[in-house]
């Protein structure tokens, strides 16, 4: 879902959602959302109706359970009700939602909840088969189970919003006045969650956290008190809070979020503290890089980002000092700098409240991301030691494996397609089902390219797809991860499609470049290194078959396609 334009969403409910959609309409943060309210009180008719003509980017369904599950309403009102009857109705509702979801690229369903003051049958309310709270929890689990394999249905947790709102979540006054059950604080929480979900699905999650050291990763000023006297762990409540904060950062790192350091300190002393302090949860190898010196932090951040080849829009900067935070906001506005609590005991909570690290599925490459970047540092160090690029490439002992799309690489292929910006010819964003539908057309073909070398297995890092018609091939997707750019993988990919074209009697290969604010590196490669001829008026590149296909030395290619 590309949210650079205004997104259109249709909102379906059995209570008054007007306050919620008003907030969405007037919120200026991306993505901008144009709302449409479905007719009130027509839930099942709409879910089961003919929705083929719907022209919305996404759907959003938020319901009160007792108004859509009749057996559950009977239970609430004290009638003897069979649990199996309730679950049958839940399954029927899920089937209707699944049918409705076919009209959308994405459909968001809000989990069911009851007012926090609702006591059900009191002490026995969590008892199996008789308790209303017990039943509601299992109804929500049934929703999750039924939607688990549906790639375009996302279940949002309303209990988070209600919990954050506390006792003010439900409003009796609004309910009796306008059939609006929730106070606006709940709607504001829901707005944040929905927009965060859209960003996550669109591959716009943050990839990296840059951290200060003093009073950020540990308590105290290292240069003044020495590493032995830092507040970190031990029998100290502040030290314990810093250990918990580091543990939370470590968890994010294990999920694929990169960590780095930018700190005003003496580098040798700082690295000694990281190495020697027995309570350090984060070790040196947990960070993909550091800039520890007395230079301006904005300069150091830009230096670090250039070295690891990550754009500032993918970065979060955490620093306890409000002056430093303001400096980065002013000098590098693309970097997200959250407000940070003065109370060090609140650091872990503040980190968990950031919703910019959510991901829509995790691949092997995500879990190994820090190792891959550390391996890239080793490659760059080796490059600086050798006399030429060819010597460097030869020393890497690179192997490229070519495959067609399959069940094993589908998730990673879609992830790479939806996240890659720089080396991306047309910046096409597709879901798994949409990509499979496209590839399964008889005149379409897609290859993936995996890269390994002596330092690491970078995994699936390249995608090339084509459409062929008689004697003409059009290159659609030409995508390469920034981790392997500039290592002749681009040329290997083009050689593959040229050789394929020759074998199949093709007369013409054309690639149309669709510019975005982020994919100029792709254009630069095609202009200077692809060997294709640029046709400016068409913004396209043409291969001249009178040319010989250049040999790419020092790289082994294994073709499993």
Predicted regions and their residues:
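Terminal substrate-recognition subdomain of acyl/acetyltransferases
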Residues: 307, 329, 333-396, 499-561
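Substrate-recognition element of Asp-dependent hydrolases with the DxDx(T/V) motif
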Residues: 244-278, 291, 328, 412, ...
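A conserved beta-strand-loop-helix scaffold within acyl/acetyltransferase catalytic domains
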Residues: 276, 401, 405-480
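Basic, amphipathic juxtamembrane/active-site segments
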Residues: 222-247, 333-340
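Glycine-rich phosphate-binding "P-loop"
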Residues: 230-237, 277-296, 303
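Extracellular glycan-modifying ectodomains
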Residues: 1-210, 217-218, 223-228, 323, ...
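Conserved Lys-Pro-Asp/Glu-containing loop-to-beta segment of HAD-superfamily phosphomonoesterases
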Residues: 301-322, 328
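Acyl-donor binding region in acyl/amide transferases
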Residues: 451-454, 460-536
């Amino acid at each position: 879902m590309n949210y650079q334009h205004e997104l259109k969403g249709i909102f379906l409910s059995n209570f008054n959602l007007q306050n919620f959609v008003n907030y969405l309409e007037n919120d200026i943060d991306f993505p901008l959302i144009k709302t449409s309210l479905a007719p009130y009180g027509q839930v099942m008719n709409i879910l089961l109706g003919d929705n083929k003509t719907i022209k919305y980017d996404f759907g959003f369904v938020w319901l009160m359970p007792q108004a859509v599950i009749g057996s559950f309403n009977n239970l609430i009102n004290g009638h003897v009700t069979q649990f199996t009857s309730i679950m049958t109705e839940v399954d029927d509702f899920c089937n209707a939602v699944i049918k409705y979801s076919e009209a959308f690229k994405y459909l968001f369903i809000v989990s069911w909840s009851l007012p926090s003051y609702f006591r059900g049958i009191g002490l026995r309310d969590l008892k199996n088969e008789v308790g209303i709270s017990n039943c509601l929890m299992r109804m929500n689990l049934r929703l999750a189970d039924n939607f688990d394999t549906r790639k375009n249905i996302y279940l949002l947790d309303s209990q988070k919003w209600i919990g954050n709102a506390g006792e003010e979540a439900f409003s009796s006054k609004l309910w009796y006045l306008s059939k609006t059950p929730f106070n606006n604080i709940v709607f504001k929480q829901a707005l944040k969650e929905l927009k965060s979900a859209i960003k996550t699905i669109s591959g716009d999650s943050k990839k990296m956290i840059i951290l200060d050291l003093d009073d950020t990763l540990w308590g105290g000023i290292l240069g003044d008190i020495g590493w032995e006297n830092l507040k970190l762990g031990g029998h100290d409540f502040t030290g314990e809070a810093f250990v918990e904060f580091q543990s939370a950062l470590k968890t994010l790192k294990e999920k694929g979020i990169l960590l780095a350091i930018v700190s005003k300190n003496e580098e040798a002393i700082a690295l000694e503290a990281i190495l020697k302090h027995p309570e350090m949860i984060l070790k040196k190898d947990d960070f993909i890089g550091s800039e520890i010196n007395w230079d301006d932090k904005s300069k150091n951040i830009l230096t670090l980002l250039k070295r690891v080849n990550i754009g500032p829009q993918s970065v979060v900067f955490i620093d306890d000092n409000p002056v430093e935070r303001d400096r980065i906001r002013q000098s590098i506005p693309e970097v997200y700098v959250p407000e940070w609590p003065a109370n060090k005991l609140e650091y872990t909570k503040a980190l968990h409240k950031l919703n910019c690290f959510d991901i829509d599925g995790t691949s092997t490459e995500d879990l190994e991301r820090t190792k891959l970047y550390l391996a890239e540092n080793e490659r760059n160090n080796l490059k600086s030691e050798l006399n030429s690029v060819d010597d460097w490439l030869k020393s890497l002992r690179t192997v490229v494996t070519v495959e067609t799309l399959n069940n094993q690489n589908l998730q990673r292929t879609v992830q790479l397609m939806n996240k890659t910006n720089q080396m991306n010819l047309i910046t096409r964003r597709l879901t798994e089902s949409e990509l499979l539908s496209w590839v399964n057309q008889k005149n379409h073909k897609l290859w993936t390219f995996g890269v390994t070398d002596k330092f690491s297995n970078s995994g699936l890092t390249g995608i090339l797809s084509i459409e062929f018609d008689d004697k003409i091939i059009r290159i659609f997707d030409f995508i390469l991860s920034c981790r392997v750019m500039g290592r002749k993988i681009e040329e290997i990919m083009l050689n593959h499609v040229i050789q394929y074209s020759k074998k199949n009697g093709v007369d013409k290969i054309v690639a149309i470049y669709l510019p975005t604010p982020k994919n100029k590196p792709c254009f630069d490669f095609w202009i200077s290194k692809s060997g294709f001829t640029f046709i400016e008026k068409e913004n396209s590149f043409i291969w001249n078959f009178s040319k010989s296909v250049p040999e790419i030395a020092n790289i082994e290619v294994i073709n499993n396609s």
